[in-house]
Each structure stands twice: as C-alpha cells, then as structure tokens.
Amino acid sequence: MAPVKSQESINQKLALVIKSGKYTLGYKSTVKSLRQGKSKLIIIAANTPVLRKSELEYYAMLSKTKVYYFQGGNNELGTAVGKLFRVGVVSILEAGDSDILTTLA
C-alpha cells in the first residue's frame, strides 16, 4: 500500500480532474479513447482482472499512453472519482487544472 499522505494527494488530484478536466470511466470507453489516441493517462484499480489489465496495458503501449496503478480496489477508485459505484479504470483525456499528468506519470 502507498503511504496515506501520497494516496490522499492522488485522490485530491483525481477529484480536481473530475471537476475541471475531461475523463472517461470504464473499460470499453477507455479502450475506445486509447484506440483513438485521445487518452493521456489511464488509472487502473488494483483488483482489475489480469487479462483485462494486460489488454489495457497493450493498448496503452500502442498509443504511447502512460499507465498508473491505483493502490486501492475498484470501490476505492469509484469513491476517489466521486461516484457511488465501482470503477475499474479511468482514462484522463484532459487534466484541466490538475497537475496529475506530471505527478503520476
């Protein structure tokens, strides 16, 4: 597990992206944004199935997109983006006011 302070700062930066930037949630829309070359960073939850994770890594490698592995599960990632449901993967298209692209990648 990541230290609590760094995990909280990541959650804050992610919340700022949700408020001011553009993003997509979920596997299908993330793969679509990766194939179109629109994604700048993808965040994958820790409990994502191995096959799905490897497919996301493959598409990210093809589109030269950075990958960040979130320390919590999909419940925690859903809470971090302010949703009341589980989120396995988040694709950040535009960071907005956040410096998450330089910090995480």
From Swiss-Prot:
PROSITE patterns: RIBOSOMAL_L30E_1, RIBOSOMAL_L30E_2. It holds the Pfam family Ribosomal_L7Ae. Signal peptide: none annotated. The keyword ATP-binding does not apply. GO terms for biological process: cytoplasmic translation; negative regulation of mRNA splicing, via spliceosome; rRNA processing. There is a cross-link at residues 22, 53, 83 (Glycyl lysine isopeptide (Lys-Gly) (interchain with G-Cter in ubiquitin)). One of its GO terms (cellular component) is cytosol. Keywords: Cytoplasm, Isopeptide bond, Ribonucleoprotein, Ribosomal protein, Ubl conjugation. It is found in: Cytoplasm. Its main location: cytoplasm. NCBIfam families: PRK01018.1. Component of the large ribosomal subunit (LSU). Mature yeast ribosomes consist of a small (40S) and a large (60S) subunit. The 40S small subunit contains 1 molecule of ribosomal RNA (18S rRNA) and 33 different proteins (encoded by 57 genes). The large 60S subunit contains 3 rRNA molecules (25S, 5.8S and 5S rRNA) and 46 different proteins (encoded by 81 genes). Component of the ribosome, a large ribonucleoprotein complex responsible for the synthesis of proteins in the cell. The small ribosomal subunit (SSU) binds messenger RNAs (mRNAs) and translates the encoded message by selecting cognate aminoacyl-transfer RNA (tRNA) molecules. The large subunit (LSU) contains the ribosomal catalytic site termed the peptidyl transferase center (PTC), which catalyzes the formation of peptide bonds, thereby polymerizing the amino acids delivered by tRNAs into a polypeptide chain. Belongs to the eukaryotic ribosomal protein eL30 family. This is Large ribosomal subunit protein eL30. It comes from Saccharomyces cerevisiae (strain ATCC 204508 / S288c). The gene is RPL30.
